Swiss-Prot record:
One GO location term (cellular component): plasma membrane
Transmembrane segments: 1-21, 34-54, 59-79, 99-119
Binding residues for Na(+): G70, T73
UniProt subcellular location: Cell membrane
Homology family: Belongs to the fluoride channel Fluc/FEX (TC 1.A.43) family.
Pfam families: CRCB
Protein name per its UniProtKB record: Fluoride-specific ion channel FluC 1
Domain of life: Bacteria
Regulation: Na(+) is not transported, but it plays an essential structural role and its presence is essential for fluoride channel function.
One GO BP annotation of this record: cellular detoxification of fluoride
Catalytic activity: fluoride(in) = fluoride(out)
Length: 123
């Protein structure tokens, strides 16, 4: 039961932060590329990589890894925006968005792991 509470607490905070950042970025950026979701997923990938690299205890992992970053990042929105770009006839912009998001997510996850290892003295 405690596990579910930790995940729920972290997830709700992550989802609220994602919503807030999406609104703030949307107020400043009016382009046709899904910048908010892209940035949020990059930040989330980095943070999750950092958390993973520190190999913290299960309680922190459930609160932050599964909960917070699970609520903060969003695969469903990523797919929705890709489909939307396709429906708008923006094929190459869609391909760019999909590939850039995947590549950048992997790079930022690895960067987070590297930074965690650096701080632990393992690099």
């Amino acid at each position: 039961m405690v596990d579910l509470l930790l995940i729920g607490l972290g997830g709700s905070i992550g989802a609220i932060l994602r919503y807030t950042l999406t609104k703030k970025i949307g107020e400043r950026y009016q382009g046709d590329w899904p910048l908010a979701t892209f940035l949020i997923n990059i930040i989330g990938s980095f943070g999750l990589g950092l958390l993973y690299g520190f190999k913290l205890n299960q309680v922190i992992w459930l609160l932050l890894g599964t909960g917070f970053f699970g609520g903060f990042t969003t695969f469903s929105t990523y797919i929705y925006e890709a489909i939307f770009l396709m429906e708008e006839g923006l094929f190459w912009k869609n391909v760019n968005y999909l590939l850039t998001s995947i590549f950048t997510g992997v790079v930022f996850f690895a960067a987070g792991m590297w930074l965690a290892n650096f701080f632990k003295g393992g690099v």
